[in-house]
Amino acid sequence: REKMYAKLNNWTLTFDNKTISAQVPGDITVDLYRAGLVKNPYFGLDYKDIEWVARRDFTYRTTICADKELLNNQSVTVVFDGIDVFADVYLNGTHLGATKNMFLQYRYEIRNLLHEGNNTLTVEMHSTLNAMDKIDTTGYYAIFNEKRMFVRKAQCHFGWDWAPKICAYGIWNDVYIECGSKQKINDVYVVADDKGNAAFFVELNYNINSTYDTLGVMVKGSYEEKLDDKLHFYVSDEPFAEADTQKTVEVVGKKNFACFVNQSAKLWWPVGYGEQPLYNYRVELERDGKIISVKSGRFAYRTVSLVEEPKGDTLYGYQLQINGVDVFVKGSNWIPIECFTGVVTDDKYRRLT
């Protein structure tokens, strides 16, 4: 089964022929402040003196020490849980890929690029603001920065009525090595409704040369993997209880599907309308009698509908329904507790509770 081998620490940050220590998760501006190269952006108007940071390119580096234990795995993956935002990733000089979305996880298979001993992992960060300058926004308008809506990062980084203009920048979430079987479950997506139906969509990382139609149905393909593998599905209403429902299906390719019907499903309701029961699932990938990959999670039985009704010739009213019942929706805004997303900690959240 895949497992986390190690988190990657001991990063450095290089720019203008200078190299300083960097913290990951973290932020480039915060690293510069720790090194005494910029002022405290939270003091007075000093944030205006750091605007140059988001105009520069920076390079992160760290070392992956590959021993025989690591190299004995079929698959070794370097995982980035969050890079803000534009970057190119290299291992030993080989380009692994580019990032352009702060909110996505990026995964790169590196087993064939590793050699025993030290391997250099490099992340070349590209200026967010310079990239935005190239975006054509003719005909668009937005407050604070008309180009911000085209960049997949926290929009408050471009300034707001409650925050200064501090464009956070860097590796803001964990970086780690996963290793294990070459064949594994990439993702499980669950769609459930208020009738007790639950559909499980399972994506495997099999090497398949295939063509899919617009509905995602494979119309032709050739498989490099064995197709006598099995997927086992288990569903229960308690975290560690014996499965109430289970099913086994044959693997048919990269995308697989299974359905369950629960005649006595307990429905999920918003607070004030009922309870919020969650069901637990576990999906196992079996090969040659051994479980080689597992994914688990929780889901709820519910149906969410936005009902639109005419209110005249040109006006439409709308009503949100949960499980066919009209609900009144209200809420509030949460202002981030830090301008620099990468330095937010659980302790800072607890201090506010």
Predicted regions, residues:
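Extended acidic/polar, glycine-enriched regions
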Residues: 112-118, 203-310
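Active-site-adjacent substrate/metal-binding segments within catalytic domains
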Residues: 40-66, 70-79, 84-91, 97-100, ...
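Short strand-coil-strand connectors
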Residues: 14-16, 81, 92, 222-224, ...
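Short acidic/polar inter-strand loop motif in beta-rich domains
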Residues: 126-133, 287-292, 324
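Surface beta-strand/loop "capping" patches
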Residues: 179-210, 312-319
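Accessory beta-strand-rich segments of carbohydrate-active enzymes
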Residues: 4-5, 9-16, 27-36, 55-185
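A short, compositionally biased
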Residues: 5-10, 83, 211-214, 276-281, ...
